[in-house]
């Protein structure tokens, strides 16, 4: 069997046998909202107790409460869920949409292309089997979350988000876990706690979006904005030369397991329409697309043959399928294209290069820019959010922050204000390849030019010397720009610039970017961000190995790395690891020092010995003569040498050997 067939067969087997997957020692829980049908899915990580005293026969333990964390996996992490990818996920938002009374179910699809696909019997074997007619706003109605927010309405989606973003912070009362630095937010104002009203205000202001198409009721509400947790997007999608529908559905499920807050389907190969339907119906997270890719397929890949009519039909096709946000390269203007001529790497955005070629071949202004108000009308009818694409982003650090890049950003700032006139939720896409010293300028200019609309960046990649490791080179920039105020990061995988990512690449990219996003949250001072860090640090200091693994982003890898060096069962409770060994573990030594100090204090209290303060000890030391100090040091030195000049002695060695023999 060829590698391609084998990969496809494995993907088919995966989705045929798909069962909910849970991380070790975790369970799916639901936090109840103000109404019966508002239940917010979270992951709860259970921890072992801490030994605080007693003896071998009567140990005394202190409980470590379970930790609640954000969970993007929807039904895929719920053992009680009945998953069938051929039927799709439960449409749990359907009732919320219907009860608002401002949408209607159409008799059939509106897109001419979709009508052609449905009439083609040759596609029956590929088609998602449980298709329903799409919804659209009633005449003269706007159905966007931005519209509701501006009307002062707190939707169920907004309440869901508030509960989710807080991560049960109010339940955590251990000062060890709640301690945090106030952070440096660079002007971001984060609610503490985050309330439904705060969510509404941020959406109404345009500082945050809730990307939820009315035709994607399976999606769980989430928010993108700099005053909330930094989000991460994963890219999937087939191409003309590789991947299949089965593989893309597998990658979707895999992405949500490892923390993708949104997923972009960047398919460019055959069966784009059918692949997208399977993805949306099985996605608990918002789905984004770049519609120009499919429009180009419809004109046989010839950019010059693109036109507004084809693109418009593509927007309606995708909106009625349930796409939650469109990337639109409307800022690539004819007059900006010559600005890229002296660049080292020219135009590297696929969508940007398509529109640049169209502009030059027709010597006309970008038709996406010319028809931008028409695009907004379509988006407003389905609550599709706009992600204004950065077609002029730099493809090398040599081209960073140049005239072309910032000219386009200025235009995007103008377009976002037009979108807001139509109550269309909008975010701004950013670079790209930017050295560390130029990253903050990008964030500052975006906030200024785009009136604080959320920023969504690809990296940025901070150096160009590491093909195969660009998840690292870009993760550095991603952490920095997340701290400065970026709302969502688009992941980069190890295959960036080299090939289409597989499952393992997707995982590596997501873990890298979840680290970057979390580091940004901690640095900004997000109220609930550092709790998980503190819990893991406490587990590490107390040598609760299983809790260390399970509180981390990737428990399986952490456990495998530890067991690779110390596979014995006894090593899972030992107070050292293979890095330093039993004699040089700094945390073990610290614990021994603490125990010694505590025992000494108890002895002094028992014997009525006056316990001096640090200042009193210093006063005594100051009164000693130099000769007295030297004599004391000499005596201690002689005692150390008499015992063999060993840092650790037989008792500690015997204790360690006993642990390893268990």
Swiss-Prot record:
Pfam name, any one: ThiC-associated
Cofactor: [4Fe-4S] cluster
Binding residues annotated for [4Fe-4S] cluster, in chain numbering: 577, 580, 585
Positions annotated to bind Zn(2+): 433, 497
Cofactor descriptive note: Binds 1 [4Fe-4S] cluster per subunit. The cluster is coordinated with 3 cysteines and an exchangeable S-adenosyl-L-methionine.
Metabolic or biological pathway: Cofactor biosynthesis; thiamine diphosphate biosynthesis
Chain sites annotated for binding substrate: 235, 264, 293, 329, 349-351, 390-393, 429, 456
The keyword S-adenosyl-L-methionine is assigned to this record: yes
Keywords: 4Fe-4S, Iron, Iron-sulfur, Lyase, Metal-binding, S-adenosyl-L-methionine, Thiamine biosynthesis, Zinc
GO BP, one annotated term: thiamine diphosphate biosynthetic process
Record-level Gene Ontology MF annotations: 4 iron, 4 sulfur cluster binding; carbon-carbon lyase activity; zinc ion binding
EC number per UniProt: 4.1.99.17
Record's keyword annotation contains Iron: yes
Record's catalysed reaction(s): 5-amino-1-(5-phospho-beta-D-ribosyl)imidazole + S-adenosyl-L-methionine = 4-amino-2-methyl-5-(phosphooxymethyl)pyrimidine + CO + 5'-deoxyadenosine + formate + L-methionine + 3 H(+)
GO cellular component: cytosol
Enzyme class at the top of the EC tree: lyase
Family: Belongs to the ThiC family.
Quaternary structure note: Homodimer.
NCBIfam families referenced in this protein's UniProt entry, alphabetically: PRK09284.1, PRK13352.1, thiC
Name of this protein: Phosphomethylpyrimidine synthase
Lineage: Bacteria, Pseudomonadati, Pseudomonadota, Gammaproteobacteria, Alteromonadales
